[in-house]
């Protein structure tokens, strides 16, 4: 180390001005210095909540490279505007610190305080330090700046001292590598890869040896476990997402590293599942800043120092605040369960259930709700119990917040977390799917029946999926899902599904529901004036989208996103006769919207009596056979089982077992997909891959 000769002085004249008083204690908050002129925020590292503490430090400057002096309880920083050292007390008013030999050819953005020495770092310039002890007896003392090294390779934007071993750590923004610095020589030692990149403008330690870094670009707070010497020696130092804080292009932080991160009068809510589910703070368990507005149940949650690990419970400490979620019906594999969520205010609910009872929420399908929007009061939700869930007791976690994108762990700036032990019943049910477990088929309709008209087969396009639950070789439940893909019609049409061969009386109406865009409808859509089991999805599909285009998703030069999805969950009575139930995909069809015109040569306002089905599928009991049979080019013949086809086998509805790209508006199906003609004429024996986009004419089909 070398001491530079005195060549530059930075002096402040205090006169009769009162000096800033130090902090009263070693505060648990982290302090975030942002913007120019600088503003100081209090950052709760546990939840990510930030609060503006001081918008005016008394100096119209940017302050960076800040660090907290534990012995004298001041924050020291570097004024990048005037290239001078400042300090702030408990009122966050900045005052100039007199120095000698402070470099003037560059600024500093990296700094921290340890053992009453203020350390500064600049990539390519070196490591510097300032002895702060003379200020104890003379606040106007001139402090000498010492240059420890002249080389500094890692690209840092902050570093911090470990309160346990006194080592100095920082992350290279370019590589994500964690380095330890020798404060006597300035030499750096590579520890390991944190796995994260970015401008980590603020770094802090807590008393337990956890290193927290805040990334400027997105405000995300990461935590690195440096509490274990063996882990450090092994280079096992991953940065784990811990909370969401404020983002800023100019960011620096200071904190009293000897303080715990949670105050004794905590206003943070934790969970209480076993710690294998990541419940405690050490495990990065879920925790919410209690904001006084956002909670589940009837009462504001009480604050905890940490997560309670089962058999201890949040309900045995403070108030009984685990009362926001109610399981109305049993959790039976393959079936839907009704959940009641009581919310204090509108917000977002996410939830996880450990279906395979392996002690975590990491597995596929274990996130059961994702940013489900709740309104104030009682919310009824449908939860589909995983078909492969194990029988017996397991755990569920519910998180309610004003934030979206929460995981089962990590911090939140608002809301509450509630953990529940639940019981799942698995009595041997199995599932079968159409067209596959996760795939969707395509239904495409031409609504000009019994005429072919433009035959663009895009008047109604619906993506379609079915899951049947089977017990003892008997269908007991069916879930039909759909995504509205396109509407190229001039007429108004509805959409429905018939479970042919099944009587309406076989439906368990108390356990049958229909959801539109995730919200439960008031009724299931079951037609009460029909003998068959027919479900109306919509009487008018034009009410399910809005567009500035001439048509919805049929013109490549004018595109929209999907706007409507439905989920129809049908449960059958225990003694239901399903011996005549048709197989999947059942009978999906379109019909004329009631009270609307549907073309020449048809009865005025035919409504439900006008239907279009897949080829060779008989219409429902509501079809007006007397007035509609024999019209146009349709050659339906009940005696031979022919329905909804022309003499050349052209149908008015298509079922394709994949997500298909339909013809553009006014483009004949055969023009877009030439191979379809021979497919139809052969009765489906030739050109069976006609619908693949590789067999289509470019620019003749819609490309989402």
Predicted regions and their residues:
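An edge-strand/N-cap motif at the start of beta-rich repeat modules
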Residues: 21-52
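A short beta-strand motif characteristic of beta-propeller blades
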Residues: 49-57, 92-101, 138-150, 187-194, ...
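A broad "non-catalytic interaction surface" signal
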Residues: 260-456
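Conserved beta-propeller blade signature
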Residues: 25-34, 74-77, 117-121, 167-170, ...
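A eukaryote-biased signal for long
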Residues: 532-704
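Blade-level signature of beta-propeller repeat domains, shared across WD40, Kelch, NHL, RCC1
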Residues: 219, 224, 232-263
